[in-house]
Structure formats: C-alpha cells, structure tokens
Amino acid sequence: MLEQMGIAAKAASYKLALLSSREKNRVLEKIADELEAQTESILSANAQDVAEARENGLSEAMLDRLALTPARLKAIADDVRQVCNLADPVGQVIDGGLLDSGLRLERRRVPLGVIGVIYEARPNVTVDVASLCLKTGNAAILRGGKETYRTNAATVAVIQQALEACGLPAGAVQAIDSPDRALVNEMLRMDKYIDMLIPRGGAGLHKLCREQSTIPVITGGIGVCHIFVDDSAEIEPALKIIVNAKTQRPSTCNTVETLLVHQDIAARFLPALSKQMAESGVTLHADDAALAQLKSGPANVVAVKAEEYDDEFLSLDLNVKIVAGLDDAIAHIREHGTQHSDAILTRTLRNADRFVNEVDSSAVYVNASTRFTDGGQFGLGAEVAVSTQKLHARGPMGLEALTTYKWIGIGDDTIRA
C-alpha cells in the first residue's frame, strides 16, 4: 500500500512544482469551500472517533482536542484561506549575480518534493499541513494519530476531491488511513519517495524516527522551556510573564516548565509567586531551597523529583529551582533543556546578552514570554512544526522551511576556461 502511495506522491510532486501561485491559491480556496460544503460527512467520522476514544478512557481534555464542531471546522477552512494570503516563497531568487566568466548565476527557492508528516491526534493538523505543503508545491503523505484516523480519512477525501476538481492528482495529498503502527516503521524507510519527514508527537516518536528513519528528519516540538528570574528582575512584570507562559495554554510546547530563580531575589520573589500561582491553580514542584520558602504560602507545593526537570508537563505544573546565578541557570538549561524556548527576566544588559549568546535554543527571549514561539506570532503565518534542531530549519517552520533551493546558471554559449 505505501509503495503505491509513494509512487503517486512523487508523480504528483512534479506537477505541483510547476504551478503558479495563482493556481495553488485556487486549489486552496476550493479545499476551504469543500470543507464547509461537506461538514456533515467530516463531523460524522469525527463523532465515531470521539465515541471510540471515550470508550478507551481518554481524558476529557484529550477528547476536547479530538472533537470537531461546525464552528471549529469553519475556523479550519478559514485558516486555509489565510494561507492563500501568505507570500509564496517558491521561485524567489535568494541571491545571485554575473560571474567574471560571463555566467549569470542565481539561487532560487524550489519545493522539497514529498513531505511525510507523522502527528498527534489533532484533526486540524491534517488540513494545516496539507495546505502548507500545497502552497509550497509539495506533495504530502500524512499519518495522523490512531484516535482520529476516521476523521483524517474523511478530511483527506475532501481535499482529494478538491484537487481533482482543479485538475490535479489526488496523490498530491494522501493519508495512511490504517491505525496499524507497523505502517509507521514502513513509512520511515520510504526514502525513495519521501524527501523530508516531520514527526509531531512525544519523545518516543521522535526517538523512533531519529533511530529508524532512512529519510532526513526534522524533529522538534518537545518543549522543556525555562524562565530564569535574575536578581535585577522587577517582580510584578516578571509575574505577569510567568503567568502567561504557564497558564495561557498549558498543553502547548512553548509553555514554561521550569522556573529558575536567582538566590538573591528568592526571598522577595517566591512569596509573590506563591500567591499568583495559587490564584492560577498551578502546582509548584520545588527544590529543597525553594520548598523551604514556599511551603508556608498559599500555592500547592510538592518536592520536585530529579526526573521532573526533564519532563514536559503540558499541565498546570511548574518546577521551581533556586540557582546561585546566571552561570548556574545556563548550566541547568544546557543539561535539561530541549533547545526549544528559554527566557531571562532581567534589567541587566550584560546578563541579557550573555543569556542570549550562551543558551543554545531555537528561540531565546529577554523579558518576554516563551509563548511567542509560534509561526503566527513570528509573522510567518501558519507553521507545520517547531524545529529544535539546526538543519535545515530551526524554530517555527513556516513556508520557507518547506522549500530548498537550486543553483541556476544562464550562459551565452559560456564555457569554463
């Protein structure tokens, strides 16, 4: 089955690469229209997925992530229309010029080809990824979470109908509609057809892809994010940033998980933190030094376990550790961070500069929330993932991250001397 999908995707990628921006936008508009027109069939498939997930004991929070409503589906369709408004990077000349030899050389953005994405049980990701791939002239092979495989299949069927209505092959967007996990291992070895693989899920999936894939893999999205409260930080602004970074959407990868507090500000800062976290319903996991100062406060406090410094809670839980200073904070981040998003709260320019230069994460902030690590917030439009590696993309992956480039030399019967 996957062999045939790969053949179809590769063939479709050659056609997509030749489309103009106007033609690609016409396809996206058609997809958005069809998603709204076929709302009933998609919601019916989704209802079956949600019912099965409830029988399997998934939490209410997870069920809410799985569920689609007419309003949510309308929002997904509107997001596709927003992709139409994004600048198309394909065909952009990055740089170039006339060489001494007389050869005119330019470096031009082109599609990657076929992109494979393995992702968690969020039905909106199917449409988000498909629309971004199509906008950049790439074909896509999608493998969504088993909890929403019916929803994904119904959604991709609608996308394929829209593609064919625009004269394009259905193979441009395909979904592995079986929940069989063995197919993931098979997909990881499809380097003959898939040019880049993006896993969006937990640490186990990322480890599997890094170790087993014969395809170049872009990993990321696991966010053990830190905020360091320096001794010069102003307490009230710092608390606002921490509340935003922890409570706005706790289940996201750019949520802060560990708070590092300079020992010289701890006695003034921690009581205020306890009050604020109690109001926000956050449980604090404190080291011995912090626990001694927090246990008399109103917040729910427990002793931190060593392994929790490596945990992505994705919940209203926050590690709190008192550190000797900036060097100690940087050392902790280097040991436990995932190179996602880390921040310093300080009024000392020298410390801010050191933190920015010495913390090796895809996004580093000074006096700002880690929640900004997002394609929309960065002005990139939608994102396909957040990369925490260094090649070839880093941070929120917008449209440009779904392209590569080729060198084009134009001569006038030019030969090398």
Swiss-Prot record:
Source organism superkingdom:
Bacteria
One function term, GO molecular function aspect: NADP binding
The top EC class is oxidoreductase
Per UniProt, subcellular location reads as: Cytoplasm
Q: In which pathway does it act?
A: Amino-acid biosynthesis; L-proline biosynthesis; L-glutamate 5-semialdehyde from L-glutamate: step 2/2
**InterPro entries from the xrefs?**
Ald_DH/histidinol_DH (IPR016161), Ald_DH_C (IPR016163), Ald_DH_N (IPR016162), Aldehyde_DH_dom (IPR015590), G-glutamylP_reductase_CS (IPR020593), Glu-5-SA_DH (IPR012134), GPR_dom (IPR000965)
The EC number of this protein is 1.2.1.41
* Cellular compartments per GO CC: cytoplasm
Q: Does the keyword NADP apply?
A: yes
Summarize the protein's role.
Catalyzes the NADPH-dependent reduction of L-glutamate 5-phosphate into L-glutamate 5-semialdehyde and phosphate. The product spontaneously undergoes cyclization to form 1-pyrroline-5-carboxylate.
Q: Which PANTHER family has this protein been placed in?
A: DELTA-1-PYRROLINE-5-CARBOXYLATE SYNTHASE, GLUTAMATE SEMIALDEHYDE DEHYDROGENASE
Q: Which NCBIfam families match?
A: PRK00197.1, proA
Tell me the protein's name. Answer: Gamma-glutamyl phosphate reductase
